[in-house]
From Swiss-Prot:
Active site: residue positions: 8, 130
Underlying gene: hisA
Protein species of origin: Chromohalobacter salexigens (strain ATCC BAA-138 / DSM 3043 / CIP 106854 / NCIMB 13768 / 1H11)
Recorded catalytic activity of this chain's protein: 1-(5-phospho-beta-D-ribosyl)-5-[(5-phospho-beta-D-ribosylamino)methylideneamino]imidazole-4-carboxamide = 5-[(5-phospho-1-deoxy-D-ribulos-1-ylimino)methylamino]-1-(5-phospho-beta-D-ribosyl)imidazole-4-carboxamide
Protein name: 1-(5-phosphoribosyl)-5-[(5-phosphoribosylamino)methylideneamino] imidazole-4-carboxamide isomerase
Origin organism lineage: Bacteria, Pseudomonadati, Pseudomonadota, Gammaproteobacteria, Oceanospirillales
Metabolic or biological pathway: Amino-acid biosynthesis; L-histidine biosynthesis; L-histidine from 5-phospho-alpha-D-ribose 1-diphosphate: step 4/9
Origin: domain of life: Bacteria
GO cellular component, one term: cytoplasm
Amino acid sequence: MLVIPAIDLKDGQCVRLKQGRMDDSTTYGDDPVAMAARWVETGARRLHLVDLNGAFEGKPVNAEAVTAIARAYPDLPIQIGGGIRTAETIEAYLEAGVSYVIIGTQAVKEPAFVGEMCRRFPGHVIVGLDARDGYVATDGWAEVSTLKAVDLAKRFADDGVSSIVYTDIARDGMMQGVNIAATAELAREGGLPVIASGGVTHLGDIEALLEVADAGILGAITGRAIYEGKLDVAEAQRLCDAQLATRRS
């Protein structure tokens, strides 16, 4: 299981939002490449980037910062979400060196688009499902649909989607712990590896996810906890590696 630092980009700065509210953000730095370097130096093996402006505007806004990070670390898997709604955007990011693109709102509104992109860019497409009380939210979390996250995940399992990034938006940025039950249920029933997001607060949350990792938990994205020093990326990754070694022995 991977511990994946999040770098959320708003107006070219590194920020964290509370529950997806653009008017409730904390700024942690104004140099995205330097922030990426910080997490790489702690041993991060993948980075999760989010173009927050892009998520709300429906098109890339912070692509320059994303590209700069990808070019600075060409061997590091990088996933980007926010404003990815066209094949042209996906192609541009992949050509810039990004490893995975996360389709969120567009996946909910136009599921056929996901299958088309998986065929065109095999192995590079992740679907981001943001949910409140099990129901999928779209448009930068501004709208909550009547679709259940588990049901939607099942649709994408046959399309060739690489994995699901699952965010419990009631907990994201609130330091309230991961929704373990919902994450494990999605992994078991959705048929795809799941990257947990939202609510990772301390090492105990990583330990709790490790308990259900066999259900298909690929990793855990963490933001505010690592920025505020409540979770050490290196320590958390060592714990994951040790657990894996124990299971293999």
